[in-house]
């Protein structure tokens, strides 16, 4: 099976310096992107609005992404990127278990640390095995890792999108986190044409950037446009209060004995009441 990349070794392209700069920018963004979200969760002692499966998918997706970037000998910054990103994703996942699911501290730590050790061992095994296969011209595992990374990274947003449409609002997500994350995806994508063009890596970073921009669009629609339409203005509130007073008086007149069904003056009413009592009085 043909490889999804060119055969030129990394760093030999005339614009390799530009590729390195963009890759470093992308790595820096991806390394710090979750920090605003982690701080937000810590201060609120809550992960409400942040889907646990969304974060877990990123933890899992970092495994094939790291393996793919390593065996494809991409830019050194892109090799380090998934490892640092996964460490922050593990931290956020711990917060989801501890704050969101209310797990005991020891249980949450045990699960996360065990998962981290398993992930590290699995990555090392896959990298060695796939590189051995490449020497024997078996390249389909490389393509599989690239496709798996692309699917897992991007499908992780599906539960988040479902939560957004159900709530008709974007809540619990740090916009700074999304801005940094989408910038990291964009810079990583831009690093590819300047050195080694990798189709699967381009699809991964490019599609992730588009999906994250979609969250911003939904936030503008639900949190700004629709919210403003459903919120009455000051003029509407003033008119409603005055109109409500008039309605209250009208309803009071209707249901009052001395209201619309009582049109006689008080003097006539008193005389009428006296005559009535006299008429029914038994001698």
From Swiss-Prot:
It comes from the Eukaryota. It is found in: Membrane. One of its GO terms (molecular function) is basic amino acid transmembrane transporter activity. Glycans are attached at residues 15, 228. InterPro entries: LAAT-1, PQ-loop_rpt. GO terms for biological process: amino acid transmembrane transport. The chain crosses the membrane at residues 19-39, 48-68, 108-128, 138-158, 170-190, 206-226. One of its GO terms (cellular component) is cell tip. The keyword Repeat applies. PANTHER family: PQ-LOOP REPEAT-CONTAINING PROTEIN, SEVEN TRANSMEMBRANE PROTEIN 1-RELATED. This is Uncharacterized protein C2E12.03c.
């Amino acid at each position: 099976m043909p490889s999804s990349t060119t055969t030129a070794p990394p760093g030999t392209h005339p614009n390799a310096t530009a590729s390195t700069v963009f890759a470093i920018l992308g790595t820096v963004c991806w390394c710090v992107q979750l920090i605003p979200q982690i701080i937000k969760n810590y201060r609120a002692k809550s992960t409400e609005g942040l889907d646990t499966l969304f974060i877990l998918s990123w933890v899992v997706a970092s495994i094939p992404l790291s393996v793919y970037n390593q065996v494809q000998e991409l830019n050194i910054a892109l090799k380090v990127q998934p490892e640092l990103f996964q460490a922050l994703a593990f931290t956020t996942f711990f917060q989801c278990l501890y704050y969101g699911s209310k797990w005991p501290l020891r249980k949450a730590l045990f699960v996360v640390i065990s998962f981290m050790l398993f992930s590290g061992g699995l990555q090392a095994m896959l990298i060695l095995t796939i590189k051995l296969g490449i020497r024997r011209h078996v390249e389909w595992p490389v393509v599989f890792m690239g496709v798996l990374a692309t699917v897992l990274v991007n499908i992780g947003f599906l539960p988040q999108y479902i939560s957004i449409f159900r709530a008709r609002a974007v809540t619990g997500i740090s916009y700074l986190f999304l801005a940094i994350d989408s910038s990291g995806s964009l810079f990583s994508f831009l690093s590819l044409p300047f050195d080694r063009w990798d189709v699967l890596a381009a699809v991964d970073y490019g599609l992730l950037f588009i999906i994250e921009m979609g969250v911003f669009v939904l936030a503008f629609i639900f949190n700004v446009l629709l919210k403003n339409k459903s919120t009455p203005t000051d003029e509407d509130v003033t008119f409603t209060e005055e109109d409500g007073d008039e309605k209250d008086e009208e309803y009071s007149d209707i249901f009052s004995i001395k209201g619309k069904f009582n049109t006689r003056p008080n003097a006539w009413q008193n005389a009428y009441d006296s005559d009535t009592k006299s008429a029914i009085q038994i001698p």
